Structures are given as structure tokens and as C-alpha cells.
Amino acid sequence: MKRSEFYFELPEELIAQEPLEDRASSRLMILNKKTGEIEHDIFKNITKYLKPGDCLVLNNTKVIPARLIGRREDSGGKIEFVLLKRISNNEWEILVKPGRRAKIGSKFVFGNGELIAEILDTTEVGGRIVRFYYEGVFEEVLDKLGEMPVPPYIKKKLKNKDRYQTVYAKYEGSAAAPTAGLHFTEELLEKIRQMGVKTVFITLHVGLGTFRPVKEEVIENHKMHEEFYIVTKEAAEEINETRKSGGRIIAVGTTSTRTLETVADEDGYIKEKSGWTDIFIYPGYKFKAIDGMITNFHLPESTLIMMVSAFAGKENIMRAYKIAVEKKYRFFSFGDAMLII
């Protein structure tokens, strides 16, 4: 299958640059994957499309302020790190720019010297392995010195760090937010629970690989990045109970979808499990775990538009995206939402 089959024209002004004042006031497109029928609504009305006995599966990862701006210890030259993956207590895999300044053995200073980094090695994808030196707790140092690593297509500075977190974010480890969850408020989640819909939490730490473009023209040749996930015994049991009783499993976001499809058996039952997933879902994939998906509007030719095309049908998705552009829906991380059922 060709990458170009997932291309669509997107005017730049439709790329949302900041979140709306009220999380739940974003627009909602409802796509029926069987009939291709489309409805338009507001996210706070999502309860109209849920039924008692359904189960929403949400990703409770928390974004860390993974972007660090510092200087080279000897020359003072500016450097930017983005933390990707913790390897051990003090060692991380990072992205760095400019790369020419980050030679093995070189050291960098952040803040007033509260954090020092030494380059240990290079990675296959042009990143680096670094060791950090600091006093106290690393997370506290990072919270003081780091910035939120908002996606490259967002040019405005984020006024409030919390708006790039879901209201239920709990476990630190992501370099990007699971953005489908940004639309939920505490009040809306409570309303959903009161109508007899379960909310179950799993964890997948989102890596920056989620923004990595597909470079292969034949998409089957694309190598997917790895992300760490945790599905607890309690979460697996709750989801499996819903499956047994005939309720629908609705994944909130592509990250929840990736996790559930990774740990599901052939009958769609979920196992308690943790580990790394590099699952790549594109048209032709047979879904085992989910009956519905809440997601944002994704980049042309991205692995995410390929995943939603696998779930709803490529023709349905490309037509829905064309309508979304015509109706001026807001796209990407701070944009509007789609419910596929």
C-alpha cells in the first residue's frame, strides 16, 4: 500500500495552535464505520453516543517537561535536548540539536549548573545516550528546568503546562500527550460514569516517534517506534467483563488502541501485561480488542491516519477528512475530535 494514498490537502490555518478555553467545547465528528454516515456535534455531548454497559479505556500517562535548553560546558554553544527514553536511573536516550555539538565525551550545563549531561554514545536514528549529574530527585530538577515538548507544528508558546496534560494524567513518562484525552473534563467523566459507562485506565508512555514521518513509499516497509505500556490485572478484568456482557470497548486515542491490540488474545480478551510495543496498524489489520475509538484529526501520511483508516475503512476516513477540512474542523494535538463507532 502506498503512503501517498493517505495524503490530503490541509490549509495551515486549520492546525490548532492552542487549546480551547473549555476542553469539552471542541467539535466532535461522529463516523459510523459500517455505513460511513457522518454527524457533527460538540464533545461535551459525547454521552449521546455512549450506552450503559460500554467501557471507555483511557491512557493515564503524564507528559514530562522533556525539552531542555542548555549550553556546552567548554564553548558555551547553545544545545537543545529532548528526552526520549530512560535507560537506567541517570542514563537517557535523547534527541539533540545541533547534533554537531554533541560529540561523545562532551558535557553540557543546564540552568545554573543544577543539571550536567555527558554524551556517552550515539544511536542508530541520530540520537544520543547521555548520563545526567545532579543533586536530589531527577524529576524535581527536570520540572524546574524542562519545558513541555509540544509538537513541531505548534508554533505558539504554551501558556499553561497543564493544558498539555489530560485531567487524569498520573504516571510520568511521555514525551507527548495522548491528545484524544485532552477533551475530557472531570465533570464530563463523572457524567459518563453516572450513565453506567465504565472508565478504565491503562498506561502507554508516548514517544516522539509518534511524530516521525513515514519515509517509505510502500508503508509496509516502515519501521515503527517502540513505546512502553502497562495493563494492570484490574484494568484487564474490567475490560473483559464488558466484553463478556456484550458492552462496547471504546479506546480513547490511538495510544490506548495500540496498547489494547498489543495485549489482546484472538478472542479480544485482554491480558495483564507490561512491556514494549512496536505494533504498526494499517489497512488490512484485523482488530481484536476494540469496538470504537475517540481520536483527533491526524497528519497526512502519518501512521495515525493509517491506523484510523484500518479501523473505519480508508475511503470512509479520507472522505471524513475532506469534510472536516471543508467544515473547518481544527486539526492535530489541540484540535477537534472524532468518534468512530
Swiss-Prot record:
Example of a GO MF term: S-adenosylmethionine:tRNA ribosyltransferase-isomerase activity
InterPro entries: QueA (IPR003699), QueA_dom1 (IPR042118), QueA_dom2 (IPR042119), QueA_sf (IPR036100)
UniProt cross-references to SUPFAM superfamilies, sorted A to Z: QueA-like
Highest taxon, organism lineage: Bacteria
Subunit structure: Monomer.
Stored HAMAP family: QueA
Protein name: S-adenosylmethionine:tRNA ribosyltransferase-isomerase
Source organism per UniProt: Thermoanaerobacter sp. (strain X514)
Upper lineage: Bacteria, Bacillati, Bacillota, Clostridia, Thermoanaerobacterales
